[in-house]
From Swiss-Prot:
<comment type="similarity">
    <text>Belongs to the peptidase S14 family.</text>
</comment>
<keyword id="KW-0963">Cytoplasm</keyword>
<dbReference type="InterPro" id="IPR001907">
    <property type="entry name" value="ClpP"/>
</dbReference>
<feature type="active site" description="Nucleophile">
    <location>
        <position position="99"/>
    </location>
</feature>
<dbReference type="InterPro" id="IPR033135">
    <property type="entry name" value="ClpP_His_AS"/>
</dbReference>
<protein>
    <recommendedName>
        <fullName>ATP-dependent Clp protease proteolytic subunit</fullName>
        <ecNumber>3.4.21.92</ecNumber>
    </recommendedName>
</protein>
<dbReference type="InterPro" id="IPR023562">
    <property type="entry name" value="ClpP/TepA"/>
</dbReference>
<dbReference type="GO" id="GO:0051117">
    <property type="term" value="F:ATPase binding"/>
</dbReference>
<dbReference type="GO" id="GO:0005737">
    <property type="term" value="C:cytoplasm"/>
</dbReference>
<keyword id="KW-0720">Serine protease</keyword>
<keyword id="KW-0378">Hydrolase</keyword>
<dbReference type="GO" id="GO:0004252">
    <property type="term" value="F:serine-type endopeptidase activity"/>
</dbReference>
<dbReference type="InterPro" id="IPR029045">
    <property type="entry name" value="ClpP/crotonase-like_dom_sf"/>
</dbReference>
<dbReference type="GO" id="GO:0004176">
    <property type="term" value="F:ATP-dependent peptidase activity"/>
</dbReference>
<dbReference type="GO" id="GO:0009368">
    <property type="term" value="C:endopeptidase Clp complex"/>
</dbReference>
<comment type="function">
    <text>Cleaves peptides in various proteins in a process that requires ATP hydrolysis. Has a chymotrypsin-like activity. Plays a major role in the degradation of misfolded proteins.</text>
</comment>
<feature type="active site">
    <location>
        <position position="124"/>
    </location>
</feature>
C-alpha cells in the first residue's frame, strides 16, 4: 500500500489532465521530502530545484520536510543546491525533521523557515561505521570528524548559536518541539493552523 501515489484530475479549458500528487504540487513550486534522505531522493530533489529555477528564478520554492534524516553526502548535495540556486527556498517541517532533515530545515531562506505546531526537530552528530584494515578505519574516522565540524559550523551559521553550543548540543540526540526549535534558531516561525 505504501507504493501508491494518489492521482489528481484537473479540469482545464482543454479538458481533463491527470497528475500524480507530487507533480501537481511541483506546479505550485512545492517539493516534498517524505522519508529517509539517500542519493536517489537527493537527485530527485535537486532536479526539481533546478527545474523550478529555470521556470522562474525570482519565485520562491517551498520544501516540505518529514524526514528521519539520512546519508550525509546526499543531504549536503541538497544543501549545496539550496544555497546555489537563485530562488529563495522556504522550509516547512511537518511530522519530523531529524538529523539531516533538521539540517536542511535550518538551511532555508532567512525568515522563511517554519514548522507546524506538533512537529519534532532533532539535531545530532553524524553517524557512521566502517570495517576493514586499520588504515582505512583511520581514514574514515578522520572524514566523519571533518563532516561533524562542517555540519556544526553550518548549523551555527544558520541558527545564530555559538559553535561551542552547537558542538555540545549535537554530542547526543537533541529533540525539540517546534517552539523550542524557534527559540534555538532552527526555524523562524511556528505556522498556525489555517482554521
Amino acid at each position: 500500500m505504501s507504493g501508491l501515489v494518489p492521482i489528481v484530475v484537473e479540469q482545464t479549458n482543454r479538458g481533463e489532465r491527470a497528475y500524480d500528487i507530487y507533480s501537481r504540487l511541483l506546479k505550485d513550486r512545492i517539493i516534498f521530502i517524505g522519508g529517509p534522505i539517500d542519493d536517489h531522493i537527493a537527485n530527485l530533489v535537486i532536479a526539481q530545484f533546478l527545474f523550478l529555477e529555470a521556470e522562474d528564478p525570482e519565485k520562491d520554492i517551498h520544501l516540505y520536510i518529514n524526514s528521519p534524516g539520512g546519508v550525509v553526502t546526499a543531504g549536503l548535495a541538497i544543501y549545496d543546491t539550496m544555497q546555489y540556486i537563485k530562488p529563495a527556498v522556504s522550509t516547512i517541517c511537518l511530522g519530523q525533521a531529524a538529523s539531516m532533515g533538521s539540517f536542511l530545515l535550518a538551511a532555508g531562506a532567512p525568515g522563511k523557515r517554519y514548522a507546524l505546531p506538533m512537529a519534532r526537530i532533532m539535531i545530532h552528530q553524524p553517524l557512521g561505521g566502517v570495517q576493514g584494515q586499520a588504515t582505512d578505519i583511520d581514514i574514515h574516522a578522520k572524514e566523519i570528524l571533518r563532516m561533524k565540524d562542517l555540519l556544526n559550523d553550518r548549523l551555527a551559521h544558520h541558527t545564530g548559536q555559538p559553535l561551542e553550543q552547537i558542538t555540545r548540543d549535537t554530542e547526543r540526540d537533541y529533540f525539540m518541539s517546534a517552539e523550542e526549535a524557534k527559540k534555538y534558531g532552527l526555524i523562524d516561525e511556528v505556522m498556525p493552523y489555517r482554521k
